[in-house]
Amino acid sequence: MLEIIPKYRIIVVEDTLELPVESLRNLQYNIIRMKVRSALLKSGTEVSADDGIRTSLRLGDSSLIIGEIRSTEAEALYEAMRVGALANVVAGTIHGASAYGVFDRVVNDLKVPATSFKATDIIAVCNPIKSPDGLHSWKRMLQLTEVRKHWREDPLIEKGFTDLLKYNVKKDELEPTDDLINGDSETLKDIASNVKGWAGNWDAIYDNVLLRAKIKKEIVEVAEKTG
């Protein structure tokens, strides 16, 4: 969420209040939190997650963050993503051990049409890494996967997933894949197509990616030193 430019309004839809909304407000982010009813409850004073998402669409250009996608709100979410109703980032959390696991959950469990799933651009897979004795664990991002748009029914069989970053457990770090290094990213190229100096220039795009990585690394190192 910190990657969103503060001038853009952020709408957070959650049934359990977990995201650091107040901290972001203290950093001058324009952020609205909408508390919705749990998917486990059929009635109550709070609106459903489905209605919460549809209400957020009426607020105009915003970034939409869903705390966790659990039920029928998935259909409303993908409807918004397909039509570009929010004109900015749409992100959410869903349980899945891999990119295909997310696809399986969204399409087969939550009944979102497979063609609608193509509105997904990027899937970040996070899971705990355990110590050999099983007593310790660390949360890590294991892969960053791009969802291509050319497949029809099954993105796994039809090569609709492309890993851009993969976790190296020995080095304890994310590493770029050959696809990313060689410029085989439709998402990044699509973003770059609207940026002067980046369109059609993969070297400029990748240099900027590396620069941003160095900036983030410096921020983390300073934070660790200063506590």
Model-derived features: positions:
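C-terminal non-catalytic accessory extensions
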Residues: 225-227
